[in-house]
């Protein structure tokens, strides 16, 4: 086997190699990124990853800062057939690009309903509310039932009921009408989807930063501040970190305590501020607080990496509870503070 050379210059890296380094740097917890790739992309990135060899720390840092800075400064983007073709050609063989683009360009509506199934329900509802109820009925009859239900829930009630009525009376739709609806969706909705999406790049980067350990987070925030201070400040304001749990009300703290494994809680509180630690203890029974303190004392010295992982885990539990409506989170910005 040939000896793998060390990677010391970002300029010499291909697209798949850059993706491989970013994924390695983010670690094994970011499986959702892999799930978004198709089989061919996974194969290319995996091959690049296996052949990387040693990557210097400076290259990793430069590449991640380049990635973060690019995502933060780009803002809204507009995709097109030509832009996609140019992007793919920068890292894929031309014959693969041609085959893939031919598939994308194929018969109108070939994958349109599947694509709509992956569009956020609020975004899709925001578009459909301006269409005729009959058109909406056709669209919702073609997507999966669970997604159709979420879209209907986002529509104005009277309009949604009218759409439901049309769906109940619907007869088989002529192919010509379906083709026209699909073409309209492709040209008026899908092509502008990036501009209608409510989630911006700063929110995405804040989520990524939330999953860094504190040393990595501090390093990249500092590096980003040197390149783009405004972007760094926006990301910091959008981040929800462990210390922000101090803004939970007593009911929220108690709900979080019930949803957090005891071992994880002890490890997370081991590295918490006195204020936050006391807040959690005050929402436990006297006996439970005493046992928790004893468990923490018996741990002895613990690794910062393990504390960070436990705290990130608790933040994720809090976010999951908030998504279910069981607690309310306030971010790090002043506008999110609660008045009682």
From Swiss-Prot:
GO biological process, one term: chemotaxis
Record-linked InterPro entries: Flg_Motor_Flig, Flg_Motor_Flig_C, FliG_a-hlx, FliG_M, FliG_N
Membrane topology of this protein: Peripheral membrane protein
UniProt subcellular location: Cell inner membrane; Bacterial flagellum basal body
Matches recorded under Pfam families: FliG_C, FliG_M, FliG_N
GO molecular-function term, one example from the UniProt record: cytoskeletal motor activity
Keywords of the record: Bacterial flagellum, Cell inner membrane, Cell membrane, Chemotaxis, Flagellar rotation, Membrane
GO cellular component: bacterial-type flagellum basal body; plasma membrane
UniProt cross-references to NCBIfam families, sorted A to Z: fliG
Function according to Swiss-Prot or TrEMBL: FliG is one of three proteins (FliG, FliN, FliM) that forms the rotor-mounted switch complex (C ring), located at the base of the basal body. This complex interacts with the CheY and CheZ chemotaxis proteins, in addition to contacting components of the motor that determine the direction of flagellar rotation.
Family: Belongs to the FliG family.
Protein known as: Flagellar motor switch protein FliG
Lineage, uppermost ranks: Bacteria, Pseudomonadati, Pseudomonadota, Alphaproteobacteria, Caulobacterales
